[in-house]
Amino acid sequence: PDTLLTPPDDEAIRRDIRLVQEMGFNGVRKHQKLEAPRFYYWADRMGLLVWGELPSAYLFNDRAIRAGSEVAFDFLERDYNHPSIITWVPANESWGISNVRSDRSQQEYCRMLTSQLHALDPTRLVSANDGWEQVEQTDLCAIHDYSLAPESCDAYEDWDAVTKTQMRPRLVFADGNSWRG
């Protein structure tokens, strides 16, 4: 908590994990960031579960497609053997694929990354576009709803409505995609 960025040493990593656990959490989602291998080492040793998330490109273009695929491959090659990592997240809230709802090429890119992660590591779950506008290859239907009103939970009682209509702030699945679960 002292640096907000790269921990200065292993003790800082252990302290961060200990603080997370003391707050009652057993896992973290590392948002848009590949952690240093030492973080995963200590998460393994201390029993902290981790969602490994790829960083997103700012724009969707050929360079982003190539870089995303390479980063996914390198991340898995480097860190697949860490038992603390339980889920891979190739995209978050349509960052870098801002038109994934209706753009077929962005949907195919998200599918490609998800399939690549599944092929390289069939032992872990993949949350294709965590939060909204997911493609059907996702293993998790993650919904990010930032509303604070308690009654907003009522909207989630009807599963068909959740997966087929607009939730806050976006659709749960991209056009032409649906829950396979």
Task: Kindly label every feature range from the protein language model.
Residues 17, 27-181:
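Substrate-binding/catalytic cleft of secreted carbohydrate-active enzymes
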